[in-house]
Amino acid sequence: MRSISIYALTRNQNTDSLSKLERQLSGREYFLKIREWELQSMKALVRQLESHMTKVCSLRFFYSYQIPKLGKEFDLLQIKDDQIINIELKSGAVSEEAIRKQLMQNRYYLSVLGRSIQSYTYISSQNRLVRLTNHDHIAEADWTELCGSLQKESSDYQGNIDDLFQAELYLISPITEPARFLKKEYFLTSQQRDIQRQILKKLRISRFEYFCFTGLPGTGKTEIFEPADTEFL
């Protein structure tokens, strides 16, 4: 999947034809379902960028990217040689704690690339731009500062974004990396999270349940059971 110009994408007015255009530009393997509020939020973002900088059409983002197997999704990612800018889009009011939690989680997933990370959320209904500070707080953001970072002269990543985010980067062994495991610095695939939810649901109904499953080393068996150990032991 390639980065695209969100300026070009937002010139289109029809969400059906927009999905076709997005696939053509990004090389995505499937047609992305783009909802009307997403289109309107992105248009509002582009208008704000246009009022603070020139050549918005040259900006390239990975749009609505989901990490394979893990299912983690990002609205907009600009990836350069030395920095990553993440912009999340919201159409309505969202609590600052929810914004903070999402941006912190996003930053953690992105940190495997070893580049500086700038994290923003744009709430289109309020025309409000906020950022995650280095101290993990939410603060009002400056459009000029964001545009300056977006126009930084370092090269954009031109390759397939899937090549950067391999699921293996997020695997942690509780045996060889116990400190990171205890800090919960690991990630579960969507299938693993589903299994985990089923186990916790049954245990909350009746604690006298038995679960047995097998798997090869490195398949996340310990990570799946960790919340149950914490909550019920």
Name the predicted role of every residue range.
Residues 1-167:
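Accessory nucleic-acid engagement/destabilization modules that flank
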Residues 166, 170, 184-209:
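N-terminal pre-P-loop "Q-motif" helix
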Residues 174-182:
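Short glycine/proline-rich turn/loop motifs
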Residues 210-223:
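Walker A/P-loop nucleotide-binding motif
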Residues 224, 228:
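Hydrophobic positions on the alpha1 helix immediately C-terminal to the Walker A/P-loop
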